[in-house]
Every structure is written in C-alpha cells, then in structure tokens.
Amino acid sequence: MNRIEFSNMLKGKRASLDISKYKVSKDTGLTALQLNRIEDAANSYSMGNIFKYLGAIGCHIGLYKGKQSCVLNGINDFGIWVTKKRGQKISMYALAKQIGSNITTITRIETNQSAVGVDLFLKIVEAFGYELKIESV
C-alpha cells in the first residue's frame, strides 16, 4: 500500500461515517491545511496526526497477517509492535536495509523518540507482511 491508497482509505472511512472535516479539525486541533495534506496525500505526513485523525472519527488501525493481528491506537503502540516483530524475525540492520532507512531511525521508532512519517510506517508494515485496515472502534 502506498500513501495515496492509505489516504484514500482514510478519506473514504471518514466519509462513510458521515463525519465532516470541520468536526475532525475541531476534535484534533489539526488545521484545514493539515487535514488536506492527509487526505490529498500530495506530501508525506506524520503518523501522530493520523492517530489523532483516527481518534476523531472513532477508528483505529488493524494489522493482519494470517491468524496474527494487532490493533494500533497510537504511535507508541507502533513502536512496541515493531520491537516485538523485529525481535522475533529480523535484525535492526536487516530491517533498516529492507525499508531503505538506517539503524538510528529504527531505534528511535522502537523507543518512541521519533515522529514516524506515513511512508516509513507503510514500508515497515509491508516489510513484516501485514495487511492494514482502518476499523471502527
């Protein structure tokens, strides 16, 4: 999945729940420009803002691979998930190389010391072979 597909999924979920951008902006504190950046996917954006957006529309991210699943309600959940998955399967160096990043970035994600962009988030989810879904809580 790429950023455009992810953004279209977010926009579609918001529209299907009949929630206005104004309400999302009011509930999250995100500006109209930030919401447009998320929904139009012209540029990358922070997953921190995505989790605010999802909270405002009453949703979360579900990750699925066969019988394995994980629910992400915030960026901290993502760091924990990466640590758990990487520890079982792949070294930090191998993951960084696979997603075109570096060990420092992986360390910061796992210790919740770094803002994660949507493109990196999607690459990591794909690297572990998981399918992403936006689900109502």
For the regions a language model picked out, list residue spans one by one.
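A short, Lys/Arg-rich alpha-helix, primarily the initiator
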Residues: M1-S16, Y64-Q88
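Tyrosine-centered aromatic motifs in long, intrinsically disordered, low-complexity repeat arrays
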Residues: F6-M9, Y22, I50, I57-C59, ...
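Short, structured motif recognition centered on aromatic/hydrophobic residues
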Residues: L10, I61, V82, I106, ...
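Short alpha-helical DNA-recognition segment
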Residues: D18-N36, Q88-T107
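Hydrophobic, helix-prone linear segments
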Residues: M1-E5, R37, S44-S46
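DNA major-groove recognition helix of helix-turn-helix/homeodomain DNA-binding modules
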Residues: S46-L63, G117-I134
